[in-house]
UniProtKB/Swiss-Prot annotation:
Domain of life: Bacteria
Pfam families per the UniProt record, alphabetical: Ribosomal_L32p
Source species: Parasynechococcus marenigrum (strain WH8102)
Extent of Basic residues compositional bias: 1-15
Descriptive protein name: Large ribosomal subunit protein bL32
Lineage: Bacteria, Bacillati, Cyanobacteriota, Cyanophyceae, Synechococcales
Keyword Ribosomal protein: yes
Any coiled-coil regions, as ranges: none
Gene Ontology MF annotations: structural constituent of ribosome
Gene symbol of the encoding locus: rpmF
GO CC aspect terms: large ribosomal subunit
């Protein structure tokens, strides 16, 4: 069974954690930005389905 030979230092662990959290923060910011643009009607970079009104169905 594969096991690490030496214990990972706290500095290395913290550095990896900070990188991971930074990437997560960037992804969250992009998601919020896209969500805001969709809700405000300014989204132009992608296509998304729009619910049709009930009047058109009858």
């Amino acid at each position: 069974m594969a096991v690490p030979k030496k214990k990972t230092s706290k500095a290395k662990r913290n550095q990896r954690s900070a990188t991971w959290k930074g990437k997560a923060a960037v992804a969250a910011q992009r998601a919020m930005s896209i969500g805001k643009s969709v809700l405000s009607g300014r989204a132009q970079g992608f296509v998304y389905p729009v619910r049709e009104a009930d009047d058109e169905e009858s």
